[in-house]
């Protein structure tokens, strides 16, 4: 089950709902 908690500011949520680094430094 995915727990709906905020990701860190520099992370994004992937298609599985995981917090993934880093939305400011990649594609």
Swiss-Prot record:
One of its GO terms (cellular component) is extracellular region. Keywords: Ion channel impairing toxin, Nematocyst, Potassium channel impairing toxin, Secreted, Toxin, Voltage-gated potassium channel impairing toxin. The keyword Magnesium does not apply. Disulfide bonds: none annotated. One of its GO terms (molecular function) is potassium channel regulator activity. It is found in: Secreted; Nematocyst. Belongs to the sea anemone BBH family. Possible voltage-gated potassium channel (Kv) blocker. This is Toxin Bcg III 21.00. It comes from Bunodosoma cangicum (Sea anemone). The lineage of its organism: Eukaryota, Metazoa, Cnidaria, Anthozoa, Hexacorallia.
């Amino acid at each position: 089950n995915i727990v709906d908690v905020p990701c860190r500011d520099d992370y994004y949520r992937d298609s599985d709902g995981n917090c993934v680094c880093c939305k400011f430094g990649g594609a």
